[in-house]
Amino acid sequence: MGCSWRKTLSFFLVFVPIYLHGASSQEAAPVGPRKPFFERLRRLEEQFRRFQEVTWTHLQNIASNYNVSYNVDVRFRSLAEESQAVAQAVNRSQASVQGELAQLKAWVRKLQRRGRKVDTRLRALDLTLGERSQQRARERKAHKAQRDALQDSLARLEGLVHSQGARLAALEGRLPVAHPGTAALGPALVPTPTQPEELGPTSLKLQRDRQELRAASEHRGPPQDSSAPLQGRREPPASGSHRVLSGTAPKDPRQQAWSPQVPGEICGVGPTLVFPNASTRNVVFLSPGFVTALRALSFCSWVRTASGRLGTLLSYATEDNDNKLVLHGRDSLLPGSIHFVIGDPAFRELPLQLLLDGQWHHICVIWTSTQGRYWLHVDRRLVATGSRFREGYEIPPGGSLVLGQEQDSVGGGFDSSEAFVGSMSGLAIWDRALVPGEVANLAIGKEFPTGAILTLANAALAGGFVQGANCTCLERCP
């Protein structure tokens, strides 16, 4: 801008003198009249004024353009300064970012090293866990095989024990009818222990039991009538009877003093329940019922009935199944037969025709989920047995347990055709399978097995005509 202004000023200073010199030369010439000269001079003056105005306008434009260019230069300088500041800030930020990136790279390298260490540890842990899982799987297989073998051995042992118990019961039935003159036959029943090392544990136990039976037969005195019912030998409680269930089954056998009773009597068995008719109001609840799941069960009781059928002895119902555990008979069944139900619809039909003679009989129904084995004992004798009945099953807790009626719903839905008519006494339930020796001792009043979870002490009468009594001997009960 400064150069163009200087060029314009130089041109103006050169052009004006030349123009004035030409005008003066024309004025000095004598040619022509005087008047045209002044006119030319006026025109020239006007042209000069116009030129001056144009020049002034041009100079003003140049000045304004110079100011604009100056402002633009200032702006450019400010922009350059700002750009430099921005560049410096960018450089500083780039430097800080580079430093942070270097730190991040260092952290990443550290994390990678730690990750490799963790991966190594995880692989080692995975290998260790895999080996342990394989070892545990092998141990589980071995334990399962041992458990299966133990269950098989236990099942065989239970079968052997019950068979030996049946033989012992048969021997016990023969001993009371022997005459005094035949007492010498007692030793013949016991094998001579010439070679004890050849006898197994079961044979030794059988030998000891037979020796005990022989000693008992020597102190038993004169023979009695073999047709009489089984003799109870519990020490009777206080004399008299009443209609309140205040007595309890013996909890500890050591607290009971056993002594012989009159032949043909069953004494000291505890409370007695009498169901006089088939009314659906005749029901007894056992509380609190089963509080834990049962994988084995033993139900034993003295029973007397003369109605021609047994009816329902026991019924256990839950919300999802009203026949979780039932011992019941009805009009449509064969007289004396009873259905043993565990987890409806599975059941077994048990023969109990011996109970229809109007006399007291002792029954024990035993079941275990191991191979689903079950046994029925009547008056110490094994009358029915089987297996594969609800194998591995558990009777759930929390249901309603009643005597004398069959439940079609929890605590109700009774039917008179399935009601029990008769008497029960000495009822008890165990959460294990009693062995034949315990069943025999219970039937003859020798010893009450330990661990009973329910007895008639847990009974609660629910109205109706059921009578509760504590009889000195069963034959004296109503």
From Swiss-Prot:
Ca(2+) 2 binds at residues 406, 408. Widely expressed at low levels with highest levels in small intestine, testis and brain. Very low expression in endothelial cells, monocytes, neutrophils and lymphocytes. Isoform 1 is not expressed in small intestine. InterPro entries: ConA-like_dom_sf, Neuronal_Pentraxin_Related, Pentraxin-related. SMART domains: PTX. Residues 1-25 form the signal peptide. Ca(2+) 1 binds at residues 322-323, 406-408. One of its GO terms (cellular component) is extracellular region. This is Pentraxin-4. It comes from Homo sapiens (Human).
